[in-house]
Swiss-Prot record:
<keyword id="KW-0325">Glycoprotein</keyword>
<dbReference type="InterPro" id="IPR053723">
    <property type="entry name" value="Secretoglobin_Domain_sf"/>
</dbReference>
<dbReference type="InterPro" id="IPR016126">
    <property type="entry name" value="Secretoglobin"/>
</dbReference>
<feature type="signal peptide">
    <location>
        <begin position="1"/>
        <end position="17"/>
    </location>
</feature>
<comment type="subunit">
    <text>Heterotetramer composed of two non-covalently linked disulfide-linked heterodimer of chains 1 and 2.</text>
</comment>
<keyword id="KW-0020">Allergen</keyword>
<keyword id="KW-1015">Disulfide bond</keyword>
<comment type="similarity">
    <text>Belongs to the secretoglobin family.</text>
</comment>
<dbReference type="InterPro" id="IPR035960">
    <property type="entry name" value="Secretoglobin_sf"/>
</dbReference>
<dbReference type="Pfam" id="PF09252">
    <property type="entry name" value="Feld-I_B"/>
</dbReference>
<dbReference type="GO" id="GO:0005615">
    <property type="term" value="C:extracellular space"/>
</dbReference>
<dbReference type="InterPro" id="IPR015332">
    <property type="entry name" value="CH2-like"/>
</dbReference>
<feature type="glycosylation site" description="N-linked (GlcNAc...) asparagine">
    <location>
        <position position="50"/>
    </location>
</feature>
<keyword id="KW-0732">Signal</keyword>
<protein>
    <recommendedName>
        <fullName>Major allergen I polypeptide chain 2</fullName>
    </recommendedName>
</protein>
<keyword id="KW-0964">Secreted</keyword>
């Protein structure tokens, strides 16, 4: 289920035309904070992105699921995230998007 949410988040990001170079660090920061189980760390991450109260509530519920499922669940999700992020397809897409962003930024000046 969470893997499907990751794919959906990445698709929405691309559909909205948001630059991957800007969103990836934010995504991984929030994901780490959620999976870590530390509520203060999650609050700090969500403050950086100006999360609304409903978004904060939803993320805290997801974090509660991680805490309830224990360390093994967190480690397994971390492995899945690493596997997806370091796959050939994902890396190729990231490089392609970065090159396109650099071209657009250079042409825009």
């Amino acid at each position: 289920m969470r893997g499907a949410l990751l794919v959906l988040a990445l698709l929405v990001t691309q559909a909205l035309g948001v630059k991957m170079a800007e969103t990836c660090p934010i995504f991984y920061d929030v994901f780490f904070a959620v999976a870590n189980g530390n509520e203060l760390l999650l609050d700090l991450s969500l403050t950086k992105v100006n999360a609304t109260e409903p978004e904060r509530t939803a993320m805290k519920k997801i974090q509660d699921c991680y805490v309830e499922n224990g360390l093994i669940s967190r480690v397994l999700d971390g492995l899945v995230m690493t596997t997806i992020s370091s796959s050939k397809d994902c890396m190729g897409e990231a490089v392609q998007n970065t090159v396109e962003d650099l071209k657009l930024n250079t042409l825009g000046r």
